[in-house]
């Protein structure tokens, strides 16, 4: 196969002409080099291109060759283009085709440099492999998918406190009140446990070794340095339950944190299970007296540990969460007037209901109107709570609740017009000797009418028709509060509200 032959005529295209000049010039110099070496001769090549640029080649020194050229009188052979064409014509080439087939494919030094560079680049690419492959080992921040765009990545301020099966958190960055649930926040709960739509609070405070979650959060926002912001939004503490108001407490699937975690889990009761059969919302039968006494015994026995709390409960208005290893039962806090319980707040907790738990569904609208000022800014703290403590609220969404100060004066006038006096301080009922003194330090607030005292109090109080108000979680005032009341005083005050 021969190479392509071109016609020897002037190239009209400027670019093609420049390329051809570069290639053939180098070819000419290459031929001169070969001739000078092979035949031991001196060669001087002088070229002016169409732009009058000088290109020269000399086998040794150009001046020496030119000096020798001027000394000669008569050249031995002198040729021009016409002579070359005539010679070619005689040889049968007719001057129409290139006599040297290799000249067209000769390369200039510049073009060869380009080609060599391209070859090196291609070799480097082929050896390295295709670029852009992602690294196999990479880290990814985990976020909880919620409908609220204000989400935070999960942070673990106390790694020994959080159960791995519940490592999820979301945050409401604004300090507004709670809104009704929009979507379901899926959490890693025990198999078989239904999930409920949470409010838009954050789920800070997942601090138990059982599958206990805080779906609404406790108004806290986990921060990586161990300090927990408590101003996100108020909400209640409870376990993950279904939309029909059911809650299940399943035993933990992860090993308990080490004993140095400071939560007093050494003497917890591992076999405590509260499994509630499914039923429709609002149709939960009350617990029997034997069940309540058994739960009381279990809670009392589970509270006999080196620390006052078996499952720490989160304070809504605590300015900052103490580091891991401290006691969470009697944290000092102050009443905060920023939050009040509105109808939107109560509707956010719809779907929380369980026997022996707090329920607003059976309270008259007038009573709910008076329960509204008792805001969630009081301390959500239980005394010696068991691992399966639950708190649920079920209410109507169309009730208008007036927003009032969190810490009302001692002499108040309710909407009926008669003064409502704070009952005098009364001593606490007799308590079992196994309870630590942390129980006696807990005060009472008007929100206690929403939930009964901790189940370790006198069980006879559960005989009244409002036995469904008994909740293991206590909404209590901080320990520095002065007015401390017994369950009987709360019942009397609830009775005075009914007209």
Curated annotation (Swiss-Prot):
**How is the protein altered post-translationally, as described in the entry?**
Sumoylation on Lys-402 is enhanced by PIAS1 and represses transcriptional activity. Has no effect on nuclear location nor on DNA binding. Sumoylated by SUMO1 and, to a lesser extent by SUMO2 and SUMO3.
The cross-link described as Glycyl lysine isopeptide (Lys-Gly) (interchain with G-Cter in SUMO) comes at: 402
InterPro entries per record: HJURP_C (IPR022102), MEF2-like_N (IPR033896), TF_MADSbox (IPR002100), TF_MADSbox_sf (IPR036879)
Superkingdom, taxonomy of origin: Eukaryota
Q: Which residues bind DNA?
A: 58-86
Report the PROSITE patterns cross-referenced here. Answer: MADS_BOX_1, MADS_BOX_2
Where found?
Nucleus
The segments labelled Beta domain in the record are 288-295
Which first-to-last residue range defines the signal peptide? none
Renumbered to this chain, region (Required for interaction with MAPKs) spans 265-282
Query: Pro residues composition bias: which ranges?
Result: 421-436
Where does this chain mainly localize?
A: nucleus
What GO terms in the biological process aspect are recorded for it? apoptotic process; cell differentiation; heart development; nervous system development; positive regulation of transcription by RNA polymerase II
Which key words are in the record? Acetylation, Activator, Apoptosis, Developmental protein, Differentiation, DNA-binding, Isopeptide bond, Neurogenesis, Nucleus, Phosphoprotein, Transcription, Transcription regulation, Ubl conjugation
Fetch the Pfam families from UniProt.
HJURP_C, SRF-TF
One function term, GO molecular function aspect: RNA polymerase II cis-regulatory region sequence-specific DNA binding
Region: Disordered, residue numbers: 173-269, 380-499
What's the subunit arrangement here?
Answer: Binds DNA as a homo- or heterodimer.
What name has this protein been given in UniProt?
Myocyte-specific enhancer factor 2A
- The record lists the organism as Gallus gallus
| Name of the encoding gene | MEF2A
């Amino acid at each position: 196969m021969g190479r392509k032959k071109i016609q020897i005529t002037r190239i009209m295209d400027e670019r093609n002409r420049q390329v051809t000049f570069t290639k053939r010039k180098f070819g000419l110099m290459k031929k001169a080099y070969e001739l000078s070496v092979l035949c031991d001769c001196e060669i001087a090549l002088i070229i002016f291109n169409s732009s009058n640029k000088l290109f020269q080649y000399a086998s040794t020194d150009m001046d020496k060759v030119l000096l020798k050229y001027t000394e000669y009188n008569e050249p031995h052979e002198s040729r021009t283009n016409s002579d070359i064409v005539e010679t070619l014509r005689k040889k049968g080439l007719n001057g129409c085709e290139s006599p040297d087939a290799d000249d067209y494919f000769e390369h200039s030094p510049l073009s060869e440099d380009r080609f060599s560079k391209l070859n090196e680049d291609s070799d480097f690419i082929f050896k390295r492999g295709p670029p852009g492959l992602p690294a196999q080992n990479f880290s990814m921040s985990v976020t909880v998918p919620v409908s609220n765009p204000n989400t935070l990545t999960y942070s673990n301020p106390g790694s020994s406190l959080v159960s791995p099966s519940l490592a999820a958190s979301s945050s409401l960055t604004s300090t507004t009140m709670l809104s009704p649930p929009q979507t379901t926040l899926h959490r890693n709960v025990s198999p078989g446990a239904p999930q409920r739509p949470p409010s838009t609070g954050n789920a800070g405070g997942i601090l138990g070794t059982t599958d206990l979650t805080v779906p609404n959060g406790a108004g806290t926002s986990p921060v990586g340095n161990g300090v927990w912001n408590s101003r996100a939004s108020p909400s209640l503490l409870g376990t993950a339950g279904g939309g029909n108001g059911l809650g299940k407490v399943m035993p933990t699937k992860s090993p308990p944190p080490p004993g140095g975690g400071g939560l007093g889990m050494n003497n917890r009761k591992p076999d405590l299970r509260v499994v509630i059969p499914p039923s429709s919302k609002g149709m939960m039968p009350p617990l029997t007296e034997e069940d309540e006494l058994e739960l009381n015994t279990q809670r009392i026995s589970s509270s006999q540990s080196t620390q006052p709390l078996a499952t720490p409960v989160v304070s809504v208005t605590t300015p900052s969460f103490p580091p891991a290893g401290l006691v969470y039962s009697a944290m000092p806090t102050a009443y905060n007037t920023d939050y009040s319980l509105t109808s939107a707040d109560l509707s956010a907790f719809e779907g929380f209901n369980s026997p022996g738990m707090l329920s607003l569904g059976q309270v008259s609208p007038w009573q709910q109107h008076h329960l509204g000022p008792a805001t969630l800014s009081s301390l959500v703290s239980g005394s010696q709570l068991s691992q399966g403590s639950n708190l649920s609220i079920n209410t109507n969404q169309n009730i208008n609740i007036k927003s009032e100060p969190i810490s009302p004066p001692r002499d108040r006038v309710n909407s009926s017009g008669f003064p409502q006096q704070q009952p005098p301080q009364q001593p606490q009922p007799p308590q079992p000797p196994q309870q630590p003194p942390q129980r006696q330090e807990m005060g009472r607030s008007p929100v206690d009418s929403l939930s009964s005292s901790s189940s370790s109090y006198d069980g006879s109080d559960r005989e009244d028709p409002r036995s469904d108000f008994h909740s293991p979680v206590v909404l209590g005032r901080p320990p520095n509060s002065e007015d401390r009341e017994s369950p009987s005083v709360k019942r009397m005050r609830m009775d005075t509200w009914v007209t």
